[in-house]
Regions:
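N-terminal secretory targeting modules
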Residues: 1-161
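Conserved SGNH/GDSL esterase-like catalytic core that processes O-acyl groups on lipids
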Residues: 28-30, 151-251, 259, 285-292, ...
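Structural recognition of the beta-strand scaffold that forms the well-ordered cores
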Residues: 129-130, 177-180, 229-234, 278-281, ...
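Short loop/turn segments at strand-loop or loop-helix junctions that form parts
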Residues: 131-134, 140, 182, 233-238, ...
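A structural motif corresponding to the C-terminal end of an alpha-helix
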Residues: 165-176, 265-277, 301-304
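Generic structural signal for well-ordered alpha-helices
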Residues: 262-266, 296
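Substrate-gating cap/lid alpha-helix
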Residues: 276-334
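Conserved small/polar residues in nucleotide/adenosyl-binding loops
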Residues: 340-342
Length: 342
């Protein structure tokens, strides 16, 4: 039994490209589609486009997590997720583990001939959006033996958005999540690590649904499709590349320019989301404190009850590598407590 992606019994969450409802494109980490069904088997047909790293999709089937490797070959491929299940009710959440190092087109699910698709569980009413970098995507999060250490060599196999502090926090608060984050990205173009050697910044990507020109046509995002209650800014760490001008001179013209752009970006999104609360932060990834001091300065300058600056207990000094699962759990605990009291 084929289940088309536009079947109303499927539940989606994330900034997803639905220009073709029968072939939606998952771009951002933590984007997912959920299906409730009866039957003994389930497969999914996907088309993967890869820019770098090996591509893996994640899933939660009846509460148990798994993953599978995607082919880099062009065209559609069908992947068996489960066989020989008990003939009872099942819930599958298929999610994007990684950022736009690849994009995935969903072409449908395949169930057994005697299966039934059930009404989806409703999404939570509370909504969160995170504009961040690789930490917010859960990059290299599964390399738990390297907690507090530099990253091991890898090809993307340790990256899992399920274990990002962002998705953990959303689950803690029973909230939807749009994890509008990208590994390596900085605020400004020509800085950071994303899209080497020209480097695209958040200012060029935040209002796009597809923004990776190596993989697809760049498309604008319709902000009316998702209105968050809480918006988290979690960037300012990749901005020190190719040179850490903020650490070198807090009062330089470049440093002041960054603060001005950060403020303009914040004030713009405050207009786009006029009722949202904004949390300005970075992470525990090692970086110079002048970036956080700059964010505090912007927060004080904007001087709005809707805007809060948040620092983790190990902010900027927790680890030289990416955040591993236990570190993300601690970050999520601290951030969740902060959001509960706002």
């Amino acid at each position: 039994m084929h289940i088309s992606p536009d079947d109303k019994r499927l539940q989606y969450c994330g900034r997803i490209d639905f220009d073709n409802p029968k072939a939606p494109v998952l771009v951002y980490a933590a984007s997912f589609v959920q299906i409730r069904f009866t039957g003994t088997q389930i497969s999914v047909t996907l088309e993967n486009k890869r820019a770098y790293w090996s591509s893996r999709m994640g899933y939660i089937l009846d509460g148990k997590q798994g993953q599978f490797l995607l082919t880099s070959d062009p065209g559609a491929e069908t992947y068996v997720i489960a066989r020989d299940l008990e003939h009872t009710e099942h819930t599958l959440t298929l999610f994007k583990r990684m950022d736009s190092c690849h994009i995935v087109t969903l072409l449908g699910f395949e169930l057994g001939s005697d299966a039934k698709v059930l009404t989806p569980a409703p999404l939570p009413s509370r909504k969160i959006e995170v504009f961040g970098d690789s930490v917010s995507c859960g990059e290299v999060s599964e390399a738990v033996d390297y907690a507090g250490k530099p990253d091991p060599e890898h090809d993307g196999e340790y990256s899992n958005s399920w274990y990002s502090y962002a998705w953990m926090t959303a689950r803690n608060l029973h909230a939807q999540l749009h994890d509008t984050s990208q590994g390596g990205i900085a605020l400004l173009d020509k800085t950071g690590w994303f899209m080497d050697p020209d480097y695209l910044g958040i200012e060029s990507c935040y209002d796009k649904i597809e923004y990776q020109p190596e993989l697809s046509e760049v498309k604008p995002w319709d902000f009316s499709r998702y209105t968050p209650d809480v918006v988290i800014f979690a960037f300012g760490q990749n901005d020190n590349h190719p040179d850490d001008y903020m650490a070198e001179d807090y009062n330089s013209a470049r440093s002041e320019n960054w603060r001005q752009h950060y403020r303009r970006f914040l004030e713009h999104l405050m207009e786009v989301y006029p009722k949202a609360t904004f949390i300005l932060t970075t992470t525990i990834l090692e970086h110079n404190e002048n970036w956080d001091i700059s964010i505090e300065e912007v927060c004080k300058t904007v001087n709005s009850p809707r805007v809060h600056h948040f620092l983790y207990s190990q902010n900027g000094k927790g680890t030289p590598g990416h955040i591993r699962i236990p570190e993300a759990e601690q970050m999520s605990k601290e951030l969740t407590l902060s959001l509960i009291h706002i």
